[in-house]
């Protein structure tokens, strides 16, 4: 029987995200074929040896709405082309592409909300941007197969 393939997606450059690395190592140790997809930044260090595959996309935009639009569009096509058995979206900023691809491929999407994304300090004094993320959250979170977070206060 072939390995079940999981694609884990993040918007960072993979090198310093120890929590996601632990999740990927655990999944790999359980026998899953894991691909961690993120982005490459100028000056990004190599991801180093890992017991799972990594892929870093070079994006034209580094921040703002064009970054999120480009990232999610490219991630969406990556997810469709790789034909995984399961998708794991880390944070709200990766969830739109995962939910759409999951719906088309008819596979489950797991949502890792390790922070309350719409309450991060970067959005505190930006009400329009915060409203946009809240609008997206209301539309994409309800359709996930499962979700988890790091603490009870975020789950509540």
Where are these regions (language model features)?
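N-terminal subdomain of nucleotide-sugar transferases
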Residues: 1-43, 146, 152-155
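Short, well-ordered alpha-helical microsegments
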Residues: 17, 94-98, 103, 155-156
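A short, charged, and often flexible helix/loop element on the N-terminal side
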Residues: 51-78, 125-129
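Membrane-proximal helix-turn-helix segments that form the acceptor-binding/catalytic region
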Residues: 73-80, 96, 100-104, 128-149
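Short N-terminal targeting/anchoring amphipathic segment
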Residues: 76-94, 107-110
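Helix N-cap/beta->alpha junction signal
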Residues: 91, 151-152
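Active-site proximal beta-strand in glycosyltransferases
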Residues: 102-120, 148
């Amino acid at each position: 029987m072939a390995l079940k393939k999981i694609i884990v997606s993040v918007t960072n450059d993979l090198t310093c995200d120890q929590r996601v690395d632990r999740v990927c190592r655990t999944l790999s140790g359980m026998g899953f074929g894991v691909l961690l997809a993120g982005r490459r930044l100028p000056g990004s260090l190599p991801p180093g040896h890992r017991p799972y595959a990594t892929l870093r996309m070079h994006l034209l935009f580094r921040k703002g709405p064009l970054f999120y639009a480009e990232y999610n569009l490219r991630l969406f096509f990556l997810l469709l082309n790789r034909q995984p058995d399961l998708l794991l979206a880390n944070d709200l900023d990766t969830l739109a592409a995962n939910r759409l691809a999951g719906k088309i491929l008819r596979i489950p999407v797991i949502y890792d909300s390790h922070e309350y994304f719409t309450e991060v300090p970067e959005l505190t004094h930006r009400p329009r941007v915060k409203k946009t993320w809240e609008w997206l959250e209301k539309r994409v979170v309800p359709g996930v197969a499962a979700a988890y977070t790091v603490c009870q206060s975020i789950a509540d």
